[in-house]
């Protein structure tokens, strides 16, 4: 599982690095926050367009040497690494923005087939644990891309970008070298069709799977909770709870540690007791954490409720793909994995705007910084609605070996 999930550490580090420190370089070439936001927020556009297409393509091919998912990883990794390495050396806003867009395109070209690789090469009884390991690696990547990279960035700005590029290539090489995809049955490979026929087939296969439809709606809501909180969480700490930026960073670090440990544990528990059952518990804990965030007014209480939120959030963001694996037809794993990734992309585009509008609306009734607590009410509402859609996603199964 370590070798299989290593690429997650690489691309998670890269994404955190780009979204955290590249804006500091862009700021030298433009004073427009809108332009900086466009360069970094463009990720949502690529995550809405590429995953489904590349996921379907990875379902339709087979190579004897590299399988069907790994060719996409091999192709995209050099583009991801090169754009990352060259970005801090670019002479102006436009070249940096282009490098960023190349990175985001390669990132989603890489990650959707890679995600589809996980169920291809692991037994059904281990899917929860694999997702737990992946969550742990994703949390480690966030730590490396935000904390470790910050130390390196202030020594020599290009250094974290160069080292992260090397990590991506090394981790991809190790995974491709050590992980061998099983050859699919010829009858399971979808026929190659034209674009219109392919779109019609995707629509029909999605329409036939009511459980997947409901689950994808629920996943969009879960991803939206995080996407809506992320841009405003520090403002909530500072203006609603009266914390300093340093205390806010400490709280986020506490959430990060909880996220990594709980993600690893929830994967093991899901395989033992059932993914749906553990997910339901996580959703109620997550909902409780969100409602607690609305009510508190003292920063001291944040040290209690944020680990609770991190615990529930880790479960809610770790297990969805492990549950989806059980719902997906084997011949369309790439397609539905792509759609799963698209829900995250749509959430990253829509949720921050909705959260910002909710804060502005709340400002009419709440004052003294309390309007930022509305983000927790919105997140709690989305979790509550998701419980309805999740209920129709199917029955639980515990696969034992």
List each model region and its residues:
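Short amphipathic helix-loop junctions that connect adjacent transmembrane helices
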Residues: 20-36, 231-248
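Glycine-rich segments within core transmembrane alpha-helices of 12-TM secondary carriers
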Residues: 47, 128-153, 341-352
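Helix-to-loop junctions at the C-terminal end of transmembrane segments
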Residues: 51-66, 262-274, 359
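A membrane-interface helix-boundary motif in multi-pass transporters
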Residues: 68-69, 151-166, 357-381
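Structural signature of the two symmetry-related core transmembrane helices
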Residues: 69-85, 277-292
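Multi-pass alpha-helical transporter architecture, strongest
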Residues: 88, 168-179, 377-401
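Intracellular juxtamembrane helix-capping segments at the cytosolic ends
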Residues: 109-122, 315-329
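Juxtamembrane intracellular "pre-TM" segments in multi-pass secondary transporters
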Residues: 182-217
């Amino acid at each position: 599982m370590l070798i299989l999930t290593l690429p997650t550490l690489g691309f998670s580090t890269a994404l955190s690095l780009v979204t955290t420190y590249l804006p500091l370089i862009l700021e030298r070439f433009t004073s427009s926050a809108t332009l900086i936001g466009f360069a970094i927020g463009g990720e949502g556009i690529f995550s809405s367009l590429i995953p489904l297409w590349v996921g379907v393509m990875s379902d339709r091919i087979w190579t004897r040497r590299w399988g069907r998912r790994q060719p996409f990883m091999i192709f995209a990794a050099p583009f991801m690494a090169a754009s990352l390495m060259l970005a801090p050396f670019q002479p102006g806003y436009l070249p940096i923005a282009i490098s960023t867009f190349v990175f985001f395109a390669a990132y989603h070209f890489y990650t959707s087939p890679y995600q589809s690789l996980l169920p291809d090469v692991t037994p059904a009884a281990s899917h929860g644990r694999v997702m737990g390991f992946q969550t742990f690696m994703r949390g480690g990547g966030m730590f490396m891309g935000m904390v470790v990279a910050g130390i390196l960035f202030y020594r020599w700005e290009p250094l974290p970008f160069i080292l992260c590029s090397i990590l991506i290539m090394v981790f991809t090489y190790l995974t491709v070298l050590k992980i061998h995809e099983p050859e699919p049955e010829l009858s399971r490979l979808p026929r190659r069709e034209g674009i219109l026929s392919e779109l019609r087939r995707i629509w029909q296969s999605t329409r036939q799977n009511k459980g997947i439809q409901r689950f994808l709606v629920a996943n969009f809501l879960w991803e939206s909770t995080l996407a809506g909180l992320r841009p405003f969480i520090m403002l909530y700490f500072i203006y609603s709870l009266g914390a300093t930026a340093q205390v806010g960073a400490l709280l986020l670090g506490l959430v990060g540690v909880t996220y990594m440990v709980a993600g690893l544990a929830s994967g093991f528990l899901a395989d033992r007791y059932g993914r749906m059952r553990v997910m339901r518990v996580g959703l109620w804990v997550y909902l409780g954490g969100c409602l607690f965030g609305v009510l508190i007014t003292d920063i001291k209480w944040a040290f209690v409720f944020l680990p609770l939120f991190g615990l529930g959030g880790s479960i809610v963001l770790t297990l969805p793909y492990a549950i989806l694996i059980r719902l997906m037809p084997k011949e369309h794993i790439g397609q539905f994995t792509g759609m799963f990734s698209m829900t995250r992309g749509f959430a990253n585009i829509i949720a921050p705007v909705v959260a910002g509008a909710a804060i502005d609306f709340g400002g009419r009734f709440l004052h003294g910084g309390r309007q930022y607590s509305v983000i927790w009410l919105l997140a709690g509402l989305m979790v509550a609605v998701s419980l309805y859609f999740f209920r129709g996603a199917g029955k639980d199964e515990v696969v034992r070996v």
